[in-house]
Structures are given as C-alpha cells and as structure tokens.
Amino acid sequence: TAHIVNTEGGGLAVFAGAMSRVIDGQKGIFTAAQLDAAVRRARRHTPKPRMVVVEQTSNSAGGSVWPLEAVREVGAAAREKGLITHMDGARLLNAVVATGVSARKFAEPFDTLWLDLSKGLGCPIGAVLAGDKDFIEQAWQWKQRMGGAMRQAGIVAAAGVHALEHHVERMAEDHENARYFGELLGNTPGIMVEDGIETNMVFFNVEGTGLTAEDFRDRLIESDAIRIGANDLYRMRAVTHLDISREGIEWAATAVRNLARFNLPR
C-alpha cells in the first residue's frame, strides 16, 4: 500500500536511482520481525539496504494508524541494522488526533519526516520536511537543483502556521464525518464499505452496482457535482476535510445510494 511505491510517477527510481522492497503488512503496518526478514545482506546480486519508510497514516490501507509501540519497535530494528528511517507523515496529525499521541513521540524514531499542510490541515498549498541541520541543507540544495525554489513562499508559510495553530484539534470532526459517511453507505445494495474507518478516509467497492469506479465517479460528478476518487477498478476513496460539513456528508451519501440503486443489475 506504500504511497512512495504505488504513486509519484516512479520518482524513487527516476531521481534517486533506488529500488523499493515492499513489506506485506496488515493494513499498511508491518512489524519489526517482518523488517528483519526483509533486510537482505548486500551481495553482488542484491542491492544494499539503506532506508526504511513508515507511512503514517497509511493512505491506501484506509487511513490506518500505526500504533506508537509498533513505530518504536520498527525504528529500533532499523537502527540495529544501520538503516536510515523516514516517516511519510503526510497525514501524521490525523494519527495524533485519532490516538492522542503527540507528533513528537511518533516522530522520535525517525531521521527525517514529511508533513503535509494541504490535506486535513486545510492549507491551499504547502508541506514541511524535517530532519537534522546537515540533511536540511542538502535538501535545500536538491530542491534548488530540481526547480523547487518558490518566489515568494512567505504567504504559504503563514497559512501553514495558522493551520498548525488552529486546525489540528478540529480534525476530530473529519474523523467523525468519515465514520458517519461509512455508516450511511453501510446497507446500500451494491456497495461494500471497507471495515475499520480510523481517520478521515472511507474506501468502498462498487462492483455490485455493475459500474466501474471510474464510471461511478463520472456519473456522480454529472448528477450531483460530487467528486469521489476512483482508486482501482472498483475501489473508491472518499476523504473528509474542513470544507465538508455534516450536511455535505448526508448529501453525498444520498447521491451515492441513489446512483447505486439506479444501476443495480436487474
């Protein structure tokens, strides 16, 4: 389910010249023992392992949250093997709100961390990359080389500061809205909602409606101007955020139910 493996246009291989080795965890969460088993001794025929990445929360696994103890155990196992550790924390603060565990505690086992400001926090643009002084200096150089310098970025930073100060706790509302949306779709003929809605994402399968996910998405846009992502042939992903109200959840759920019932195979 790893985001850096399944998306980003293969940037890991293109820009870093690196290949990935996927660990088959439970809902995107693997164990220290699985990490130990996956790290192969470097030989002529095998690439040298260098880094382990944890995605918090796990997007394609339904927004699942890594427990703090699992994070610590994987971090310790990685250090024992001399591996660099990175947290893809695009939705880290959703995990913070869901568990009550601080971002600092979740981040402690990692050398570097990525935090997105434009998802649940609601900024129009922006993200934060964190690490030690030497790493950040190198990151700035590579950012410049690859055309990532912005002019001017102060207004983006100001929005990020506001979001971090005012929008974190309110994400609990997004989580509640996601659970509510899942409940509203729960008994819809032709719709199969995935279990375990932990944060702000709801995944559901539309195969029973006779439509593909892309067809279902396009018809929702056409009929009700509602946009829900098509993630796979039949799998769809709905994401709640600060612009989605309880009334909006009910409206969207009604539209999904109506479309599903109208297209059920007869």
Predicted regions, residues:
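Conserved PLP-enzyme active-site core in the AAT-like
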Residues: T1-D195, T199-S223, G229-I244, W251-R266
